[in-house]
Amino acid sequence: MNQWMELADRVLAGAEVTDEEALSILHCPDEDILLLMHGAFHIRKHFYGKKVKLNMIMNAKSGLCPENCGYCSQSAISKAPIESYRMVNKETLLEGAKRAHDLNIGTYCIVASGRGPSNREVDQVVDAVQEIKETYGLKICACLGLLKPEQAKRLKDAGVDRYNHNLNTSQRNHSNITTSHTYDDRVNTVEIAKESGLSPCSGAIIGMKETKQDVIDIAKSLKALDADSIPVNFLHAIDGTPLEGVNELNPLYCLKVLALFRFINPSKEIRISGGREVNLRTLQPLGLYAANSIFVGDYLTTAGQEETEDHKMLSDLGFEVESVEEMKASLSAKS
């Protein structure tokens, strides 16, 4: 038995990954990558079998953000030529939900730029979500920025299932990425979502000049936060942002990162998110031996892979898509 299978068995028995073991995952020799992914899949299969959860993003409000996040094309300091618009209307949100349903995508993610939502924007999301739930029954994830307790309660009461607010990087590295809000602001929003009964979703962006220890720290911080769903983004450096031209990643390292997140957060939904196409490239399929969830279609301001290609990839791997009906049954069992 190789060392990664031994570690996987210890994790399944309840052991926690030490920093030394975590570093050994990130330093795994490239020629041993299949052994590492075998260990990660041993854990993934225990909790999720061969099922893959599909998610789709609706960019409900673009640009116009006062924050100074260095990776983001929508920030106040970005010079990237993106389309900016205020919150889309209800019909547009419903059209996106229909498209997700028709493509057998179980989770519909409503994302809005900005520091946090106005009460009017929450009203708009609430109004649309109620009809989406009645018509399509999709799992709804909202990502609207820093959240107030009363806003979280309104979203939960309307039928929103999950709230996403990423920690993005380690506490130590946070001020290198943004200074317009604190790391604790982000943690607080996830806690507010949890306290309201929303399923907490929080993840990371890898490739922002962080150290390997930073990667380990963010994976362990998300474990401590008890995020149900963990999106792992890989930086897609956009021209016009402070991180323009940064390209520190390669496909094999990205696989090691995904394996690390699975070993540290064994039972959680690990989602391969933004930047997978440009960073994992031809090794995208291998990522699903650690992760059990992906975004399908376009991201916020960057293009994704064609939906048909994603379905083909999953079929070729022998994995099974969690259908909309299975997702509905799962939600009913939890309620």
Curated annotation (Swiss-Prot):
Pathway(s) it belongs to: Cofactor biosynthesis; biotin biosynthesis; biotin from 7,8-diaminononanoate: step 2/2
Keywords for the protein's UniProt record, in alphabetical order: 2Fe-2S, 4Fe-4S, Biotin biosynthesis, Iron, Iron-sulfur, Metal-binding, S-adenosyl-L-methionine, Transferase
EC number: 2.8.1.6
Bound cofactor: record note: Binds 1 [4Fe-4S] cluster. The cluster is coordinated with 3 cysteines and an exchangeable S-adenosyl-L-methionine.
EC category: transferase
Protein's GO biological process: biotin biosynthetic process
Cofactor: [4Fe-4S] cluster; [2Fe-2S] cluster
Superkingdom of the source species: Bacteria
Radical SAM core domain mapped to chain residues: 47-276
Pfam families from the UniProt entry: BATS (PF06968), Radical_SAM (PF04055)
Reaction it catalyzes: (4R,5S)-dethiobiotin + (sulfur carrier)-SH + 2 reduced [2Fe-2S]-[ferredoxin] + 2 S-adenosyl-L-methionine = (sulfur carrier)-H + biotin + 2 5'-deoxyadenosine + 2 L-methionine + 2 oxidized [2Fe-2S]-[ferredoxin]
Cited InterPro entries: Aldolase_TIM, BATS_dom, Biotin_synth/BioAB, Biotin_synthase, Elp3/MiaA/NifB-like_rSAM, rSAM
Binding site for [4Fe-4S] cluster: C65, C69, C72
PANTHER family membership: BIOTIN SYNTHASE, BIOTIN SYNTHASE, MITOCHONDRIAL
Assembly mode: Homodimer.
Function summary: Catalyzes the conversion of dethiobiotin (DTB) to biotin by the insertion of a sulfur atom into dethiobiotin via a radical-based mechanism.
Stated name of the protein: Biotin synthase
Native source species: Bacillus subtilis (strain 168)
